[in-house]
Amino acid sequence: MLPLYLEKLTMPELKQRAEALHQLLVECRICPNECKAKRTEGETGECHSKVEVYISSVGPHFGEEPPLVGTNGSGTIFFTNCNLDCQFCQNYDISHLGMGEKASKSDLARSMLQLQQIGCHNINLVTPTHFSPQIVDALVLAIEKGLELPIVYNCGGYESVETLRLLEDIVDIYMPDIKYSIDENALKYSGVQNYWETVKLAVKEMHQQVGDLKLSKRGIAQRGLLVRHLVLPNDIAGSKAVVDFVADEISTDTYLNIMDQYRPAYHANIYPELNRRITPSEYKDVIDYAHNKGLIRGFDPN
């Protein structure tokens, strides 16, 4: 299966998408924060970023979901900064403290091609939202030099439908992390307004574009939606409503990775309710609930 950008778009169309995305940076509305920062003129957005791209690391990753990892790894590019401000972020040095190095569009294109050369199964863009125009610029260069891997958009779910529509037929695999169904908690712990309604609209748009996750005969992800959800202590995430949304409004064939690896990090120690690992029973409760809703892809229901 060809990547969507080779199957659906011409090079002039891809360049037009990049130009349209760049217009969203002028008074920034690339994400639902809509902070209006003039990033193209050197102002810093809510994401702590100007127009220059910063990357913390590039390489094959073997800790992602099995359909992404395959045998040779997922070709991850970790972008610095984030449009969320999660107080328990486990990658806070990258997302909040700005760890990373400046990368031109040529650098980024070169990284994509290197990941392809070493055999990675995909280009996995980690926290790409705030740099999506520049990423498409780099994709143009990489495609001209032979890139033919599927693109994974690995994000925190706080996405603008306007931006997502400009990414249609560019992204093959959307991988949003649905963090909360409780807006009050999204504001308190991640600093964003109206998260629940926003993430639902975004995930519906993603699914409309790419459908349920499709695998090759070897079990490698080729196209579709893969949803993540991290169970938080004391049900701070509102996990059952997230499961209901996926099962009832997306598809019971959704690949849903219900994650149990929460550990207190960054500023979690400030919040007693966040300052512990989840219990086995908290996790099992969500898994059992998802199984009863008919969801089985992405986790062991037993």
Say what each PLM segment does.
Residues E168-D183, D253-Y262:
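Non-cysteine beta-strand/loop elements that form the S-adenosyl-L-methionine
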Residues L139-P150, L201-M206, P280-V286:
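Alpha-helix-loop-beta-strand connector modules within alpha/beta enzyme cores
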Residues M1-E43, G211-N302:
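Auxiliary Fe-S-binding modules of radical SAM enzymes
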Residues L187-R218:
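Anionic-ligand binding region
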Residues C47-I173, I182-D183:
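Conserved Radical SAM active-site core
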